[in-house]
Regions:
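C-terminal regulatory/interaction module of P-loop NTP-utilizing enzymes
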Residues: 1-305
């Protein structure tokens, strides 16, 4: 049986949009130290706290090619390791003697190595984004990879090898949302025990201002006003879901497109803030929630702008 590789490899490089404040720098340095010590790192936090971006940043500092996997409920172990994918057919036609036609045909099953196998084989950095969206049984194959540095291989794979020794340069970075999120499975204790978990929360004020300024192109003063509005709403405790840095970025980019000013006197600014932050902080669209949040936001806009 022939063996092919599903090569989807990213070349790590510094992210042009990445904002590195002192808080983020310290966190990235700790994560990189754990990886260099031989341990996988797990960034856990609510949506919008920069887990995937931070994972990509740390991977770029590791300096090895990156293989990325996005967790999926439909995954099985073959989606990580590999499996049979069609056949390879070879046909030889021999007509050397004009009056004689000789044909030989070979059919061979083809095995394709998937991303985990490729990363283990060549010592790439694996980023497994939202790994708890995959079923726990699909992730069982990671246990031996992270602990014994061995990847168990199916008997149907060519070569007769029952396992693959993981390259010493292999490293792994995981991200996940809290377990109470919809579509998230509880990860196995045995898997969590094999990784170092770093819990991420909302960034500090300085970092949020820097991120908004970088990603939206707004001035430092305007970025500060918008972040203060968002942080005020977050600290009010009146939201179903606390607003993240994604809301201010949406606001900033929309204001740029519409040519609006960050001012309480600009109706476009007020309308944009109310719509985006009301949407971000609610999942069920409750009328009562919308009225309450808009009342808080109007007060914050008048206070800061």
């Amino acid at each position: 049986m022939a063996v092919e590789e599903a090569m989807t490899v990213l070349e790590p490089r510094p992210l042009s949009y990445f904002v590195e404040t002192d808080e983020i720098k310290r966190l990235a340095e700790r994560a990189l130290a754990y990886i260099k010590a031989g341990f996988p790192v797990h960034f856990r936090g609510v949506s919008g706290t920069g887990k995937t971006t931070l994972a990509m940043h740390v991977a770029s500092n590791v300096g090895r090619p990156v293989v990325m996997i996005h967790g999926d409920e439909e995954f099985s172990s073959s989606d990580l390791i590999g499996g049979e994918s069609g056949y390879r057919i070879k046909k030889v036609v021999d007509n050397f003697i004009h009056s004689v036609l000789k044909t030989e045909e070979y059919m061979q099953r083809q095995w394709v190595d998937n991303r985990l196998t490729v990363a283990c084989k060549y010592g790439f950095t694996l980023i497994y984004d939202e790994f708890t969206r995959s079923r726990p049984e699909a992730n069982n194959t990671l246990l031996s990879v992270l602990q014994e540095r061995m990847l168990d291989l199916p008997a149907s794979r060519q070569g007769g090898e029952s396992y693959l020794r993981v390259d010493p340069n292999f490293s792994a970075i995981f991200t996940s949302n809290p377990e109470e999120y919809a579509g998230v499975y509880r990860s196995q204790d045995a898997l969590r025990d094999r990784m170092i978990t770093l819990d991420l929360d909302h960034f500090d004020r300085e970092t949020e201002i820097a991120i908004l300024e970088k990603k939206s192109g707004l001035s430092p003063k305007n970025s500060t006003w918008i972040i203060d509005i968002v942080r005020g709403l977050r600290e009010s405790g009146k939201c179903e879901y606390a607003p993240t840095i994604r809301g201010p970025i949406m606001i900033g980019k929309t204001l740029k497109i519409r040519g609006a000013k960050v001012s309480k006197k600009d109706p476009i600014f007020r309308e944009t803030v109310l719509e985006i932050l009301t949407s971000e902080t609610s999942r069920i669209g409750s009328r009562g929630h919308q009225v309450k949040v808009k009342e808080i936001l109007n007060g914050l806009i008048d206070k800061y702008c």
